[in-house]
UniProtKB/Swiss-Prot annotation:
Compositional bias annotation for Polar residues: 650-659
Disulfide bonding pattern of the chain: 36-173, 41-101, 164-215, 276-323, 380-425
Residue positions binding N-acetylneuraminate: 119
Domain Ig-like C2-type intervals: 146-231, 251-339, 344-441
Region (Disordered) location: 606-697
Motif (ITIM motif 2): 665-670
This protein's name: Sialic acid-binding Ig-like lectin 10
Organism: Homo sapiens (Human)
Amino acid sequence: MLLPLLLSSLLGGSQAMDGRFWIRVQESVMVPEGLCISVPCSFSYPRQDWTGSTPAYGYWFKAVTETTKGAPVATNHQSREVEMSTRGRFQLTGDPAKGNCSLVIRDAQMQDESQYFFRVERGSYVRYNFMNDGFFLKVTALTQKPDVYIPETLEPGQPVTVICVFNWAFEECPPPSFSWTGAALSSQGTKPTTSHFSVLSFTPRPQDHNTDLTCHVDFSRKGVSAQRTVRLRVAYAPRDLVISISRDNTPALEPQPQGNVPYLEAQKGQFLRLLCAADSQPPATLSWVLQNRVLSSSHPWGPRPLGLELPGVKAGDSGRYTCRAENRLGSQQRALDLSVQYPPENLRVMVSQANRTVLENLGNGTSLPVLEGQSLCLVCVTHSSPPARLSWTQRGQVLSPSQPSDPGVLELPRVQVEHEGEFTCHARHPLGSQHVSLSLSVHYSPKLLGPSCSWEAEGLHCSCSSQASPAPSLRWWLGEELLEGNSSQDSFEVTPSSAGPWANSSLSLHGGLSSGLRLRCEAWNVHGAQSGSILQLPDKKGLISTAFSNGAFLGIGITALLFLCLALIIMKILPKRRTQTETPRPRFSRHSTILDYINVVPTAGPLAQKRNQKATPNSPRTPLPPGAPSPESKKNQKKQYQLPSFPEPKSSTQAPESQESQEELHYATLNFPGVRPRPEARMPKGTQADYAEVKFQ
């Protein structure tokens, strides 16, 4: 308190601490450098030694300034000079006569920062310094910027109004100067305006997007100014849409284009992240679409870019992925073809038999039965990407595809026995291979070989064989009686055997046999049946039956008589044949009896008859099983079966055999009751045969 009192006395304050003097002013005033500020102030003093016409003078001084000799920073006393540094900038705008001491400070400078006090003079008594009630002026750096009000998005071709305001205005302060600069205004130009705000109108163009617009505010002649720059956002449809891919959390890369659409290959189970971004104003709505199915989408204010994660890609994830970007001004889209590669899966064979339209699905190791002669179509099917190379093999050999364009299809128009075996479909792929096999089993109806019979000491022994798939069953019929097992009276004995597709059966008949013996062997399976019969027919006078029933002597006699007749016939024919040609002809030995040429036509089911048109007993499908009769014994007989008789002695008139020829074969036809001539087609080409008919009356 002592220092202000001392200063008051030194500076001529005669009314120090007089309670009749008071002043109201803010203690601290802050102003940015270069700006203008008004400091409101009011004061009061006693009405003593002055009248209404007495002039009142007010002064603002910097602290520690001698009021009688020092220069004030501002005063209303015209004859009193002010400080040079504040001249024209500091102004006492208040009327001291009315108790107003307001001060305006323009273009504040850093050196203006100080403590200021007010002094009043009126008449001889009022001479007072308000030393304790001044204010402190603080000058700061100019950091404040003007505010620009502009729509967030500008429509191209539509006029827009922009306002620039600097929020620092006082009534006594002069307004700043506003100006505008920017690429959008280059063709229109702007002029500086003096006001507390500025209004700008212009028409944005599409190319004005992302350009700058700046509002400048100037406060003094020394170039102190403030400015605010805004970035123009002119609306436009989505553009520059970009798709990128991240594999297994690696940095995203753009896919390589293949044609007009980028192409991406990924292995099954791999992690993929598809990213989509587009440039648009306002921000576009992004979406990922797979075959018209929306997988992911984002709002305009959502994160950018839009990601689509495929943690472990599957075969079903393959397809065309489309990213769409859309706003009110338009849309844009871009596609990506994703191919998920994987090795063959679910390899199987589809089967169609006999031209059926229904396909049967078979797995690995399946056995497939097919009837001989039917058509068969095998289709190998698998799932893989890229498609696997398919091929068919049998017994290690690659089969030619039925359709070169589709090697997985194997067609067998007519299944034959040689097709039987394992067929394998191979599916080869860079990522792995698979194969599937099926076993083809060819089924066919029985093929009968036999029956054939021979006389033995115990009686008549007959054998019969048949080949079929599945293996056939054999049974014997004696007349209308089925012979099964063994007879309790030991009159017959049946012995079956089998080996693979062959079935064999032996029949032994004991005891006397009737003259009307009819013995039949029947073979059957699920696909058909075939039978062959052996007949022993009686002659009208009972010669043959008597020979069999009355014993060996009578049989020998009849046989000798027969051979005697044949010998006479041969002797009669041979001279004629020798005169016809000198070239020796091969001769065939015969070991037949009178019963050798009794024609017996075997009966068979429809399937067996059909098979008999394709194959003969002379070419069996597989090697004959043990005990089966040789087909050579049936040569030139065409399903004629006989009961063998005793051996025939050679005629003494026959020429001896040469090394390269055999005995000449002659035929004797026995007709019961009439003659059946043999067809000429049965004779070998170039061979002449003579026939003699022997009739039993």
